[in-house]
Amino acid sequence: IKSTQEAYNIKVKETSIDYSGTIKEDEVEKNDDVIDNITIVNKNLVKKSLKDTQTETGYYIYNSVSLAKYNINGKDQLTYVAPREAENNTISYNNKTYEYTHGMGQIIASATSVTEDGNVEYLQKDISGSDNILEVKEPRIYYGVETNSVAVTNTKNKSEYDYTDSDGVEHVNNYDGNSGIQVGFWDRLILAVKNKDIRLAMTSSISSESKIITNRNIVKRAKAVLPNLIYDENPYTVVDDGKIYWVLDAYTVSDKYPYSTYTEVEYDGAKRNINYIRNSVKVIINAYDGEMTFYITDRNDPVIMAYLTLRYFLIIQEKKFQMELSNK
């Protein structure tokens, strides 16, 4: 049992709590911060509400919903955060490649309260940013969980769609980030073969100023750098310095820890037995330009320290990992 606990990093501390059998008013007052942040809204309810009320245009999808605590109006509040990603499965090839190239901002809902009608209470939902409580300066999401297609930016006679405001005016934008590559015909032909999309080579929409953005799925992007880690399938977003970042948890595993109990896990469609696991890496991905940083969060993990020796130039090692969340 001890070996298994060590291998899985299970640290259980038993604590006895004195309970009188009744709750007094002063006890409630002392713990009002805890009581105010008790989750009463179910995640699935938020997902359903988003699908019913926020996807009427068909351009966006909200599959990544996660709990997060933000300081809103001077008070810590437990919320659900859902990045607004572009829906690429229901629109045409030209639209998703040249116009609907990116998602737009985040929706934030309260996890601790509902409206008077019992519906989900949205704290931030306006795509134009009029209720931008986290002060996001760059809301566009070019890299995410749903971004599985190539995007071409700065094309001839086409601008990228941002949103339509309440007056019916379409707002557009041209990508000016560091990501993407500017290529000629032969390079486009190679990319077309690699992506099994000959239209990239044959199109007349691409100019010398255009950029082709590939490898936009953040999980696949991280795997391409460190393929030996296991990556969480439910990354979440945070806001730092006005920018949206994805946080992707990564795990090291082994099946060779002495005397530890085996567990069967399924990953990438295959099953394997492991008896050691550590959540020793966090990957931070900029949602706008795809820049990735790998942070070691557990320096006592011998597996990740071995990777550091082999691929030291790929990982930034920190004694303490912390990303400050922008708040209002």
List PLM regions with ranges.
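Soluble extracytoplasmic regions of secretory-pathway and membrane proteins
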Residues: 1-328
